[in-house]
Amino acid sequence: VLGGTAAVLSSTMPPFRDSVGDHNDTEKITGEYLVELSAAQDDTLLIFGSSELCTTYIPTHPANFFAGKRAGFQVDLIGRGSCQSLIHAIELAASGDSLRGEKVVLITSPQSFVPEGIAPDLFMANFSAQQYLDLLNDPELSDEVKQYLSGRIAELLVAYRELPDAAEVDPAIQVLAAHEQSPSLLS
């Protein structure tokens, strides 16, 4: 009986990556595995964005516009509200070789260009320590890029810790960001 139920379910469900592509799951924003899986598919276009990716009721939304692979590819949406350019820079830098040579779409929102940048609490809601560590370990990323991103992360971590309702921040990440911003700090 269970085998029959599984067969019925599997025949009515779209393939995993096709069904997950239209959703902005936290695991795709703060993780790497699902992005790497999608990037490995020849018929998938990764779209990085912010809150505009959440308005799926609009006919021109990428998930609707390209539904059913009518343009010959599946879209995979990566982002949610407050995924500003810094979050995407970290995610793209952490992707290593998985995105090398791939076409991706990066939708930048107006809030990415405000002088004060992303608010510390919104940054922390989308920040991935794993992605940060992976980008630091990428020998192909320049020290200049690593230091710039580390400096920005260090600033945001300090500002976040000053918020009255801030959750605990991993002290190792704080020290690492400060050190990478200015490598001579701990030397």
Please place each PLM-identified region on the residue numbering.
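Extracellular glycan-modifying ectodomains
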Residues: 1-187
